Regions:
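N-terminal accessory/interface modules of nucleic-acid-binding and processing proteins
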Residues: 42, 52-85, 142
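Charged, glycine-rich intrinsically disordered N-terminal tails and low-complexity linkers that flank
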Residues: 1-65
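Phosphate-binding glycine-rich loops and adjacent basic patches that engage nucleotide phosphates
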Residues: 2-3, 25-39, 67, 110-112, ...
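Alpha-helical structural motif
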Residues: 6, 34-38, 66, 70, ...
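Nucleic-acid nuclease catalytic cores
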Residues: 60, 77-103, 107-202
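Glycine-rich and polybasic anion-binding loops at the starts of cofactor/ligand-binding domains
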Residues: 163-165, 208, 212
Length: 215
């Protein structure tokens, strides 16, 4: 059963995030994050370290400024979906409360009633290596994030809506869709990895074997 935790403000929400693995942290569990290692995530979740203050980080601030506009643009371009946004809600399944997600948008397909997730990305591909990550589709770390969100919600699909700023300054909007039925095997694999990390490493306090993060 889907559980929705509502929090009144960012401070409450940040405190509640410590009770599980968030979607943006899912890739770190399996060494597919370009932002943190599984060891860094373990230290965060066991209270050995505090989350880095990203105030002043240009990429984070760029994304925060553009995210509301991306939601408005999505609604204008895809009126077949109803879009809701709850910035301080945390969603999870009652039998798996440590797999948690706060969504950039909650979608309802108007004709079918299917529920889905909007995931917004605003990537500045300022060098060749960053562009290569997007060249053939969605970077693996973001795929993990989308799988994690479907596990947490039990919903039918994720639409990843991305604004990519290229090396020459031009911008490109991309839309990718993940369907639950096509991802069941990968979702189960990720769920097992996340459960093992949480139950064996976080709850019991056993240090995991280090997995080098992707560049």
């Amino acid at each position: 059963m889907l559980i929705r935790e509502h929090h009144e403000n960012r401070e409450e929400w940040l405190a509640a995030r410590k009770a599980g693995i968030g979607a943006s942290e899912a890739a770190a569990v399996i060494g597919k994050s370009s932002f943190m290692s599984n060891m860094e995530l373990w230290r965060l979740k066991t209270g050995m370290a505090e989350k880095k203050d990203m105030t002043g980080n240009s990429a984070v601030e760029y994304g925060n400024r553009l995210e509301p506009a991306m939601r408005v643009m999505f609604e204008a371009c895809y009126p077949e979906y109803k879009l809701d946004y709850h910035p301080f809600d945390i969603l999870y399944q009652d039998d798996c409360p440590f797999i948690r997600a706060t969504l950039d948008g909650e979608l309802t397909e108007i004709v079918t009633g299917k529920r889905g997730i909007l995931e917004i990305k605003t990537a500045m591909t300022s060098n060749k290596m960053q562009w290569e990550r997007w060249k053939d589709g969605v970077p693996q770390g973001y795929c993990c994030q989308c799988l994690h969100q479907m596990i947490a919600t039990g919903w039918d699909f994720v639409i990843l809506y991305a604004k990519l700023t290229k090396m020459d300054g031009d911008c490109e909007i991309r839309k990718y869709q993940f369907e639950r039925e096509a991802c069941l095997e990968d979702m189960e694999w990720l769920k097992q990895k996340s459960a093992r990390f949480w139950e064996e490493n976080v709850v019991k306090g056993i240090q995991p074997s280090a997995i080098l993060p992707e560049l």
